[in-house]
């Protein structure tokens, strides 16, 4: 069994699915670590091609020999909520105005999508987390 690679850094970035390029933010995040940026872009784009149109958070583990591995996460909850509500952005004053609304079914669907990345295993708790996020954005849950 080969010895384990020694971890040098972990970089977290949010990139459009299937559209990573060596330009910032990828280049500025990976450049100082000496990683082959084009290779990362090719692998990331291939891994996220099916989710095109979403912003996908990615956690890149960089090793001392300049190799890397990465783990993609689910899209951010606010992005999924805005997409479900058909909005560009939330309310400017969430406590006073309502930007739009989403249904309980849409909240359940978003919660099921986000469940692997949330710190709960219960779907009901995940729904409450998503509903709270929507409320803080000025989006009503009906």
UniProtKB/Swiss-Prot annotation:
The species this protein was found in: Thermobifida fusca (strain YX)
UniProt KW keywords: Methylation, Ribonucleoprotein, Ribosomal protein, RNA-binding, rRNA-binding
GO CC terms: cytosolic large ribosomal subunit
GO biological process, one term: translation
InterPro entries per the UniProt record, alphabetical: Ribosomal_uL11, Ribosomal_uL11_bac-typ, Ribosomal_uL11_C, Ribosomal_uL11_C_sf, Ribosomal_uL11_N, Ribosomal_uL11_N_sf
Protein name per UniProt: Large ribosomal subunit protein uL11
Disulphide-bridged cysteine pairs: none
Subunit-structure text: Part of the ribosomal stalk of the 50S ribosomal subunit. Interacts with L10 and the large rRNA to form the base of the stalk. L10 forms an elongated spine to which L12 dimers bind in a sequential fashion forming a multimeric L10(L12)X complex.
Pfam families noted in UniProt: Ribosomal_L11, Ribosomal_L11_N
NCBIfam families (alphabetical): L11_bact
PTM summary: One or more lysine residues are methylated.
